[in-house]
Structure formats: C-alpha cells, structure tokens
Regions:
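Generic protein-terminus/edge-of-domain signal
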Residues: 1-126
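Short acidic-glycine-tyrosine-enriched beta hairpin
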Residues: 129
Length: 129
C-alpha cells in the first residue's frame, strides 16, 4: 500500500529528526519512522499549483515544490541495496524526471541503473562522488 506526504512535510520531518537526534536517516528509513509515528496520509494531498510559472519568485517556486505529494512505500528493514533501481524512483514511461533531494540524509555509497544530474538551485552543497 502506498502512503503520502508532501515534499515540504517530508523535508521538515527530516530536518526536525536531525536537529533533535544529530542522526541522519536514509529516505526509506524516514518513511518507516513517519509511518510508525502516524504522520503519513492514506490519500494524496492536493498540490498548490498555479499557471504562472514564468514570473514566479524563487520563494513561490519553492512553495509549489513543497506542496507536491510524495508516494511512499514502507521500508522492510532489510539492508539498503547498493543499486538504486530506476523503477524505485522514476515513474513508468518517463524519460526525464526531476526531484528535489531531501536534505539531512545520511551519505550512503550506492549506484544507479540510470543517469543522474545534481543541481544546486540555491545555497551551496558538497557533492560526494
């Protein structure tokens, strides 16, 4: 069964968990944590979309991205696979897919069976390759 939460809510929980515990979780681990705490929804939250993307400020665009729903499946507790499969992240029949990577995740050495491009739209980051 799929569960749901907005991108912004997921990120807020990642940040809160890190600030409270000093520990970073991987995406599947945080999904399990949120499920156990009762924070996930059974239905998809409606995104806050607008038609005027050409003249949006960065803050307005971030608000739209924060409102986008995530479809989450529960983590079974097994060791995280060393390969992130395309089917685990990219919807069927999509050649290009864009996500905002959540902050405060634990670095985890892995590989993909797809091509990934990282882009920092604001601030700075450290890319570990």
């Amino acid at each position: 069964m799929a569960y749901y939460m907005t991108n912004g809510e997921f990120q807020a929980h990642m940040k809160d968990y890190y600030q409270r515990t000093g520990n970073r979780l991987q995406f599947p681990e945080m999904t399990e944590y949120l499920y156990n705490k009762g924070f996930l929804y059974d239905s998809i939250p409606a995104p806050d979309l607008t038609d005027d993307y050409d003249s949006m400020s960065d803050e307005e665009f971030e608000k739209v991205v924060d409102s986008l729903p995530l479809s989450l499946t529960l983590y079974d507790g097994a060791p995280l696979a060393p390969t992130v499969e395309e089917a685990d992240l990219i919807p069927n029949a999509r050649d290009v897919f864009v996500i905002r990577h959540p902050r405060y995740t634990r670095p985890n050495l892995h590989r993909h069976n797809y091509f990934e491009i990282n882009y920092v739209s604001r601030g700075k980051g450290t890319f570990i390759f």
